[in-house]
Amino acid sequence: MKILVCENYDKLSEKAAQIIMSQITLKSNSILGLATGSTPIGMYKKLVEMYENKMIDFSDVKTFNLDEYQNLPISNDQSYHYFMDDNLFNYINVKRENIHIPNGMANDIENECIEYDNLIKEAGGIDIQVLGIGNNAHIGFNEPTVSFEKKTYVVELEESTKIANARFFNSLDEVPSKAITMGIGSIFESKKIMLLATGENKAKAIYDTIYGKVTPEVPASILQFHDDVIVILDKKAASLLNPKDYKVV
């Protein structure tokens, strides 16, 4: 596990975008695993800038998103389809047919989960998976105690996660209670994983992820067993780590 600590959020976003750009430069038809939430927004802005400056070409890239709310229309401005269009896809030359996000409106939701994993496999697997992390160390919508073997599935959202996401809705009641998420088993199959975290409120989750026992109680702790993980933090998120364990960039 490689840990990089950046001066601030802007530098973190720049570093993460550079890693994505390097991946696409190396392999023009890269398969990207993408995440939503506030943390990767800066990275997406940097990627759009890189595209506008002709530094990066997404025309052969395929993308797979981690998750989507169940029973929330994609036209809703809180759906992850909308989020990805608004923050990235509308501003780059990725082909629509190469964008994959779980369909939370599917009639057969169980089949949607199976098909999503099959699509990833058929594409050749995810080359680099972007992750954020929750205060309780959840990744995707994989909450504490979920099995590390789990593939894409429907999850009942924890109250703490609903409260954390309520800021994006008019009220807590409007936050969907279920979502489709790539399971930890699906995430772990990615060839490379890039975990991003900022802020003091993530410091404990990062500490437990890196130093703690590998346990379903700390979902992100499974990353200790992955062969190729890069963790990019700002100073506050890294505040509990031993400085000898990370590189300041």
From Swiss-Prot:
One of its GO terms (molecular function) is identical protein binding. InterPro entries: Glc/Gal-6P_isomerase, Glucosamine6P_isomerase, NagB/RpiA_transferase-like. One of its GO terms (biological process) is N-acetylglucosamine catabolic process. It comes from the Bacteria. The keyword Hydrolase applies. Its EC number is 3.5.99.6. One of its GO terms (cellular component) is cytoplasm. The active site is at D67 (proton acceptor), N136 (for ring-opening step), H138 (proton acceptor), E143 (for ring-opening step). Keywords: Carbohydrate metabolism, Hydrolase. Pathway: Amino-sugar metabolism; N-acetylneuraminate degradation; D-fructose 6-phosphate from N-acetylneuraminate: step 5/5. It catalyses: alpha-D-glucosamine 6-phosphate + H2O = beta-D-fructose 6-phosphate + NH4(+). Pfam families: Glucosamine_iso (PF01182). The keyword Hydrolase applies. Signal peptide: none annotated. Catalyzes the reversible isomerization-deamination of glucosamine 6-phosphate (GlcN6P) to form fructose 6-phosphate (Fru6P) and ammonium ion. Belongs to the glucosamine/galactosamine-6-phosphate isomerase family. NagB subfamily. This is Glucosamine-6-phosphate deaminase.
